[in-house]
């Protein structure tokens, strides 16, 4: 089971790469918070439609603009969620915005956070 966590991070980073254009930045960082470690993957792609933020973790969810970003089976994030939860962790997605109060603005990219117990 431990080796499967690598699959999660490879999937999240691969997704970030597929949604960015040549030369765009992808950030990966780790922070310890209380009894968890947070692993954060951020991209500078188009972000995620607000109504899709929870749906992206459903099996075969495909109502994303994959046609312009390459093929997608709709399984990667669902499998990642199962693996993270099997380790007692959580995973979520959010959009990066200029400020937290600026909900109406266009996203500056997407952020995926994996929280795992330490």
Task: Label each residue range with its predicted role.
Residues 76, 80:
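Short alpha-helical Gxxx[C/S/T] motif in the catalytic ATP-binding
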Residues 43:
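Acidic ATP/Mg2+-coordinating residue in the GHKL
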Residues 16-17:
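Short helix-loop "hinge" at the ATP-lid/N-box region of the Bergerat-fold HATPase_c
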Residues 23-35:
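Short beta-strand/loop element within the Bergerat-fold HATPase_c
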Residues 48-60:
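Short conserved segment of the HATPase_c
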Residues 61-71, 100-101:
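Glycine-rich ATP-lid/hinge loop adjacent to the conserved G-boxes
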């Amino acid at each position: 089971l431990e080796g499967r966590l690598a699959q999660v991070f490879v999937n999240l980073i691969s997704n970030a790469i597929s949604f960015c254009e040549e030369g765009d930045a992808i950030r990966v960082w780790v922070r310890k918070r209380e009894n968890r470690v947070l692993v954060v993957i951020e991209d500078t792609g188009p972000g995620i439609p607000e109504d899709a933020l929870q749906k992206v973790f459903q099996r075969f969810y495909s109502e994303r603009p994959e046609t312009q970003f390459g093929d997608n089976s709709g399984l990667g994030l669902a499998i990642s969620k199962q693996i993270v939860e099997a380790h007692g962790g959580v995973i979520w997605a959010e959009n990066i915005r200029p400020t937290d109060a600026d909900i109406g603005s266009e996203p500056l990219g997407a952020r995926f956070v994996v929280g795992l117990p330490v």
